[in-house]
Amino acid sequence: QDNIPIFRYHVAFDFEDNTDFIEWYANVMYRSYYTSDIPCSINDEYLTLSTCSTEIYDSRFVVVARKLRDGEDASQYTYYSNPDARKPAAFYKAYGMKVPDDKGPDYDYYKDILSKMEGNEN
């Protein structure tokens, strides 16, 4: 059993308020294998693709993308691997690794990141 709540990414859409958006964004970034400096806001449009994963039993591989804004060029951003991507407890156990002892994403940390993004009204 994991010590953090299950991220219900499949029910996240039409955020009620900025708090809901920050919670969703923090969970996405906390689990991301790859990350970038692409600015994100509650007003952007997002696409979520989810498929079966063979890493561990009954798991999913999820891709989240943000629609380009008018006049935006995706090549202006930097993309990199995230060595700290949080995986489900079952992943660590399946590969004989210690399950991280954390409480989930640090919402204040991700809220601060969002507030520093250029053109972000969060």
Where are these regions (language model features)?
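Extracytoplasmic/periplasmic soluble domains downstream of a signal peptide or transmembrane helix
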Residues: 1-122
